[in-house]
Amino acid sequence: MAVDERKIVIWCGAAPNQKALANKLASKYNVAGIVIDEHKKTSTRKKFSEIVSALIDRIKFRKIYGAWKWLMYNYASGYSEWPNVPMLRVESINNEQAAAFTREINPDLIIVSGTGLVKEPLLSLPASIGIINLHTGLSPYVKGGPNCTNWCIANNEWHLVGNTIMWLNAGIDTGNIITTEAIDIRNAADLQQAHKMVMEHAHDLYLRAVEYLFTNTKPYNSVPQQSVGKGKLYLTKMWTAEKRKLLLQNWEDRKKITLVPVVNTVPLPLEN
């Protein structure tokens, strides 16, 4: 029996870590429906040289690729099924079916994680509390992809590893912040465990943010990112072989780093 009967709809990706988050939420709250964005794209034929280059890259940087692959396997083993609730699978989160499915449920809260960029009319769908999003990076300092934790390691910015829960808007990780927290991963045994630490922290922060929203009344925490600090948007095309080399080198030297820089974070209010 859900502790709180207010209805939640989850918009999420299809990866095992999203399935884990959905199960954690459903174990505590009334998840009334889930829309799974399967990110289906039109396939394009690659040149043989591109295939060979990609294969060499994966072999050369297998520790990086392997860490994420292990994390997904770990979650797939722990959460074999999605919660037993109404579910819709779409090729894109912006499919009209996703909007219709959500309208029919009329949720109090919409929770977003791991989808493509959400656009109208979904952004304007009614929800009495609102639409919130998980960013597995510390906003406003680190945004984009392919992985904010990896960028922090490559840049030797260990103090910027963390997670953010924000109100969803039309930008890329630009919504007003509900809460942020940093996490120190330097004592992790390997990259696999480091990514597991960050993802588990992300799920825990999401659950605490939902609890905050459900146990308080408006106005909720809503901190403009520009009032917290300045950051950088990273694009996948910027994630070069040189950056991957730096990640591996910095990971090996992580114990030599002292976390001196202090940045502003946004704690959850103790009470409204």
Predicted feature descriptions by range:
Residues 1-272:
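One-carbon transfer enzymes
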